[in-house]
């Protein structure tokens, strides 16, 4: 992820994102609180909605950055995880925004026939 963040984008883009975050820190903190609250409630739909609402915001990832950071990685994991899970009991930990949506890791695994249950 750090390679994608720091080597996959120009210093100008990194500076733009940092300045945007600093200039909008209150809104960014509030957004993170909402996302954390939805995560703690295991409310994937709200998590996805919060993520989608940020689209077009200058502080948000560009579509190509979002693909690189989230969706392409989900696809790779969904391809690799079955062999890993077949070999041994497996606990998979990923960032919260890898979970929801049609291209989310949970949906990709369900489409392969896996049963997904939240941890309680």
Where do the PLM segments sit?
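C-terminal structured interaction module
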Residues: 89-120
């Amino acid at each position: 992820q750090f390679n994608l963040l720091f080597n996959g984008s120009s210093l100008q883009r990194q500076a733009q994102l940092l300045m945007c975050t600093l200039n909008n820190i209150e809104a960014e903190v509030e957004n993170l609180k909402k996302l954390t609250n939805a995560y703690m409630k295991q409310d994937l739909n709200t998590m996805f909605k919060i993520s989608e609402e940020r689209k077009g915001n200058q502080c948000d990832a560009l579509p190509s950055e979002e693909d690189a950071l989230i969706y392409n990685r989900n696809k790779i994991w969904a391809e690799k995880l079955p062999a890993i899970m077949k070999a041994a009991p497996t606990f998979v930990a990923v960032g919260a925004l890898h979970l929801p949506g049609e291209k989310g890791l949970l949906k990709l695994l369900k489409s392969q026939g896996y049963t997904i249950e939240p941890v309680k």
